[in-house]
């Protein structure tokens, strides 16, 4: 591992096969945690390449638990996180809106690493526990058209890496790899990164992984979500073609707003924000969710344009369908918890 650390520290990019070897060493319990941390920090300082990201994703997926589900049009809207904007959990809220609009959502997520509340933290604050077995995870997907995969449960080899990431306390290559390692076979994906210079490379990684259609966003102000604060950079992956474009909130009929208007807090505070949105409280939080969910519906082929997607997302909330999805998942979680106690 030290030889890879030294090479990356002097700015050397690793070839795909070399990164395969380095990735396997990271997951090897015999490798010193300090060496893994040094490698992750060196990669971050150098700047990760598409080959390095794709290689680590391949190794992680090979170690993940196998999930048997029918090959339907499953979608994930998990972002990379780690943008430092301290906003509420936009993609988690958007997942319920997407499901309310008819998308089949298999959302990958984790606890907080470099934010105040990760996806799993806010789900628990909403009343949804994240310790479902794999069978329960699939049952929820089949029953409600939405499920949440807590990364450590489906990537058991990530336990030690997770502890190292917590110690580092800032984004690493694992943030980039997270959205790429959902064990459920995906047809479409909407994901965000906070590196506008890397959107095209990230889209090429998704193409290598076999996505038929996907949208990658690098949001205004350095967000890993579509932002109301200005121009957002996108790449659309459609049947092998990579198409860059840009968009503002004004372009789809939404009001612009600074990032400070959508600041979040801890898990409990973010859960309250999400419930307020689903109860139809309009404002920047609401607009941010329908903006992102609308893009997701366009990515999933349910809307012909992003503006049409925003209208569908708005209807998902105002009709009560998004809240119904949330309540249904909470009820499922409560039922599973009661069974566990009874045992």
Regions found by a protein language model. Give the residues of each.
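A general structural signal for well-ordered alpha-helical segments in protein cores
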Residues: 1-2, 19, 36, 53, ...
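A glycine-rich phosphate/pyrophosphate-binding beta-strand-loop-alpha-helix module
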Residues: 40, 88-144
């Amino acid at each position: 591992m030290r030889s890879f650390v030294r090479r990356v520290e002097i700015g050397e990019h690793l070839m795909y096969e070399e990164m395969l070897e380095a990735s396997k060493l990271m997951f090897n319990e015999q490798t010193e945690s300090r060496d893994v941390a040094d490698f992750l920090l060196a990669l971050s300082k150098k700047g990760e390449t598409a080959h390095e990201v794709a290689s680590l994703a391949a190794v992680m997926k090979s170690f993940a638990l196998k999930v048997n589900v029918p090959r339907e049009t499953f979608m994930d809207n998990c972002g990379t996180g780690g943008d430092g904007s301290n906003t509420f959990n936009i993609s988690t809220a958007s997942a319920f809106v997407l499901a309310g609009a008819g998308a089949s959502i298999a959302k990958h997520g984790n606890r907080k690493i470099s934010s105040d509340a990760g996806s799993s933290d806010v789900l628990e604050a909403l009343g949804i526990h994240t310790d479902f077995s794999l069978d329960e995870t699939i049952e929820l997907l089949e029953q409600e058209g939405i499920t949440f995969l807590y990364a450590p449960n489906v990537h058991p080899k990530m336990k030690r890496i997770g502890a190292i990431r917590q110690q580092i306390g800032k984004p690493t290559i694992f943030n980039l790899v997270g959205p790429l390692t959902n064990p459920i076979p995906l047809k479409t994906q909407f994901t965000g990164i906070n590196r506008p210079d890397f959107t095209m490379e990230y889209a090429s990684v998704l193409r290598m992984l076999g996505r038929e259609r996907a949208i990658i966003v690098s949001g205004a102000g350095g967000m890993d979500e579509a932002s109301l604060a200005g121009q957002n950079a996108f790449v659309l992956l459609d049947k092998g073609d990579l198409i860059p474009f840009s968009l503002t909130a004004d372009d789809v009929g939404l009001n612009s707003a600074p990032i400070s208007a959508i600041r979040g807090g801890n898990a409990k505070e973010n859960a309250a924000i999400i419930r307020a949105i689903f109860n139809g409280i309009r404002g920047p939080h609401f607009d941010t969710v329908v903006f992102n969910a609308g893009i997701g519906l366009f990515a999933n082929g349910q809307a012909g344009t992003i503006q049409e997607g925003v209208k569908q997302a708005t209807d998902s909330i105002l009709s009560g369908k998004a809240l119904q999805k949330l309540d249904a998942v909470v009820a499922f979680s409560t039922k599973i918890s009661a069974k566990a106690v009874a045992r």
